[in-house]
Amino acid sequence: MAHHEVISRSGNAFLLNIRESVLLPGSMSEMHFFLLIGISSIHSDRVILAMKDYLVGGHSRKEVCEKYQMNNGYFSTTLGRLIRLNALAARLAPYYTDESSAFD
C-alpha cells in the first residue's frame, strides 16, 4: 500500500503520493537543486551544501554526513522535506505553461 499525505489548504484537500518522487544521489541538476532550495525553508549553508553534494554531486550519505558533521537522522529528515517539496512541485508543474518559464 502506498503511503499518502493529505495536504489541506482553505478546505481543499488532495493526496500527495510521497513514494512517487525519489531523489537519488546525483539525480538532480544544479539548477533544479537551487530552485528547490529557493522555495524550501532550508537556510543553513552547511545543510544546503550537504544536500547539494548528495543530490547533485552524487556523494554517498556517509561521505556527506562526515564531511559536514551532520547527524544521519537530521540528514534523513532534511532529505524527506526535499522529497516532499519536489513531489509537490512536480504536481504543480502542469498548471504552469512553458511560456511562463524564465529559465529556458
Swiss-Prot record:
Keywords: Activator, Cytoplasm, Fimbrium biogenesis, Repressor, Transcription, Transcription regulation. InterPro entries: Adhesin_operon_reg_prot, Fimbrial_Adhesin_Reg. Coiled coil: none annotated. Gene3D superfamilies: 1.10.10.2690. GO terms for cellular component: cytoplasm. One of its GO terms (biological process) is regulation of DNA-templated transcription. It is found in: Cytoplasm. Pfam families: PapB (PF03333). Its main location: cytoplasm. May act as both positive and negative regulator of pap transcription. Might positively regulate levels of papI and/or mbf. Its autoregulatory mode of action involves differential binding to separate sites. This is Major pilu subunit operon regulatory protein PapB. It comes from Escherichia coli.
